[in-house]
């Protein structure tokens, strides 16, 4: 099929609408089950369900005249009207003990379960048996005519009933047959139908308790009980790693990040676009599996990760050194393996490794030799990342480091894209100052006015990182507030005749005074980052 912009867009919207409906249906089922368990008094089971889903189901309640029992009764009534019999919802298990055990191949005695009979062909039972006793022996003509009648009766009997409960009558040849008229092909607007379906699904989803863009805290994770292939020890480690799945909403959008256009574009190419347009990312165009953000502290590396957690519909693992480093022998490499297995299990997912140099420093550089446990953990991490590169799982590793020259060379090879998140430019600094100190800013009951020359201040803040500029703006806004404290503390009388609070205007000179006492945190490291970029850059 020929690809076009409209086809890709409509395909993405249809897939997104289907996923939204499926997600809403699963959540509604869980809420219905929780409501039924609570109403029937199964409090322990309801508590276990709420803990395993980690959704906070108590925040929602079932609408009026809706419950699980009513839905089942309505289904039974519908089934009876359609098929003239009640549905069989449950059946007795042949052997519950043996069904839970893994099946072994090569055994002599094998039981045939009901699942193995599902693919057998259905036998069409005839309603009435054709009469054959009226045929006289030796009458060849009558036998042929009777066999023809039997064949027609069997055909009619088989066509009378279908698996869908429909009665079909045969059209006999003696009826007058209309002359077949040639019909022109009907023009069907598939694009319009698809667009209407998408709009209907989206509006239905929005009206059905949940919003179109749910928070990460409302994301329905797969239960760990379905995590196949792990023993009890691995299940415990999986529970430890699952605590670092980011289920909070940082509320950081792409537009909230000033600058960093190249980094945002590459993150979108690796995480967002492969999910939206999978047709484009095949073969040599497979998405990136690893991306390294390096640069001075306070330039927005972690902010990019928060934007990924907010904007991208992936399971976000926020991993630090304390997550995968253990004092027990062999547990560190097991934690690394479980981390990547969980990421594949919850795919599409993103693994964010902050302060990567604390985990993947260069091997063989420690005087006296590196600890054996640390070497095993690093080796396992490299092996797992190699497995990601060879697989088609939508698992992406996003790493951040302030000291990229301390990273192991093998890790650099696996991080395909390496982007320098440098100090903000003059335009970015001016936009940051305007964002934090606009001409009029109202914070609850206080209203702060400023008279700043933003272009002059952006030149004076050269060498400051984004966090440094935020600190300077906060200190400049705090100066007029300090005068309020002196008025409140010096007035010891019990009378309420205090003047109304009015903050002084923050001027350019106030900002420059704050700059004189607030120095940049990483100005001296700029040349070293640029030198490392010339050797190891990969954009």
Swiss-Prot record:
GO CC entries: cytoplasm; microtubule; spindle; spindle pole
- A Gene Ontology biological process annotation? microtubule severing
EC code: 5.6.1.1
Outline the segment boundaries, as ranges, of region: Disordered.
93-121
Q: Which UniProt keywords apply?
A: ATP-binding, Cytoplasm, Cytoskeleton, Isomerase, Microtubule, Nucleotide-binding
Binding of ATP: at which residues? 295-302
Q: Which Gene3D superfamilies match?
A: 1.10.8.60, P-loop containing nucleotide triphosphate hydrolases (3.40.50.300)
Q: Which PANTHER family match?
A: AAA DOMAIN-CONTAINING, KATANIN P60 ATPASE-CONTAINING SUBUNIT A-LIKE 2
Name of the protein in its database record: Katanin p60 ATPase-containing subunit A-like 2
Please report the organism this UniProt entry assigns to the protein: Mus musculus (Mouse)
Gene that codes for this?
Katnal2
């Amino acid at each position: 099929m020929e690809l076009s912009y409209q086809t890709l867009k409509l395909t993405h919207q249809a897939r997104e609408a289907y996923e939204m409906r499926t997600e809403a249906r699963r959540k509604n089922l869980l809420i219905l089950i929780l409501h039924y368990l609570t109403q029937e008094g199964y409090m322990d089971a309801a508590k276990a369900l709420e803990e395993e889903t980690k959704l906070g189901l108590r925040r929602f309640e079932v609408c009026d005249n809706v419950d699980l029992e009513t839905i089942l009764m309505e289904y039974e009534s519908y089934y009876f009207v359609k098929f003239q019999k009640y549905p069989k919802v449950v059946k007795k298990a042949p052997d519950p003990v043996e069904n839970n055990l893994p099946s072994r191949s090569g055994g002599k005695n094998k039981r045939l379960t009901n699942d193995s009979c599902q693919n057998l062909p259905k036998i069409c039972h005839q309603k009435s048996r054709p009469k054959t006793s009226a045929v006289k022996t030796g009458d060849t003509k009558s036998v042929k005519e009777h066999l023809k009648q039997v064949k027609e009766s069997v055909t009619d009997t088989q066509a009378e009933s279908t698996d869908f409960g429909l009665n079909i009558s045969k059209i006999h040849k003696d009826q007058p047959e209309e002359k077949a008229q040639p019909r022109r092909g009907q023009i069907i607007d598939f694009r319009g139908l698809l667009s209407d379906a998408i709009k209907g699904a989206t509006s239905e989803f929005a009206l059905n308790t949940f919003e179109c863009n749910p928070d990460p805290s409302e994301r329905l994770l797969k239960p760990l009980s379905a995590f196949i292939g792990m023993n009890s020890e691995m299940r415990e480690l999986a529970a430890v790693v699952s605590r670092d799945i980011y289920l909070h909403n940082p509320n950081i959008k792409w537009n909230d990040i000033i600058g960093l256009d190249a980094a945002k574009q590459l993150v979108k190419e690796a995480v967002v676009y492969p999910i939206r347009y999978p047709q484009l990312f095949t073969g040599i165009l497979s998405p990136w599996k690893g991306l390294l953000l390096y640069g001075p502290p306070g330039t927005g590396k972690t902010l990019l990760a928060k934007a990924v957690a907010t904007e991208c519909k992936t399971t976000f693992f926020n991993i630090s050194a304390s997550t995968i480093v253990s004092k027990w022998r062999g547990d560190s490499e097991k934690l690394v393996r479980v981390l990547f297995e969980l990421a594949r299990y919850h795919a599409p997912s993103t693994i964010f490794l902050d302060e990567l140099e604390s985990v993947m420093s260069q091997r063989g550089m420690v005087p006296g030799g590196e600890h054996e446990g640390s070497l095993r953990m690093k080796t396992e991490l490299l092996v797992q990342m190699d497995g990601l590169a060879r697989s088609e799982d939508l698992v992406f590793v996003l790493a951040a480091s302030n000291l990229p020259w301390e990273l192991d060379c093998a890790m650099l090879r696996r991080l395909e894209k390496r982007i320098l998140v440098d100090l903000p430019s003059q335009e970015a600094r001016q936009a940051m100052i305007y964002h934090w100190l606009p001409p009029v800013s109202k914070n609850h009951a206080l209203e702060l006015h400023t008279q700043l020359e933003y272009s002059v201040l952006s030149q004076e803040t050269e060498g400051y990182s984004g966090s440094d500029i935020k600190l300077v703006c906060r200190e400049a806004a705090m100066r007029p507030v300090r005068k309020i404290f002196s008025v409140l503390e010096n007035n010891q009388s019990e009378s309420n005749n205090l003047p109304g609070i009015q903050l002084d205007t923050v001027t350019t000179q106030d900002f420059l005074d704050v700059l004189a006492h607030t120095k940049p945190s990483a100005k001296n490291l700029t040349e070293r980052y640029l030198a490392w970029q010339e050797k190891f850059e990969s954009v």
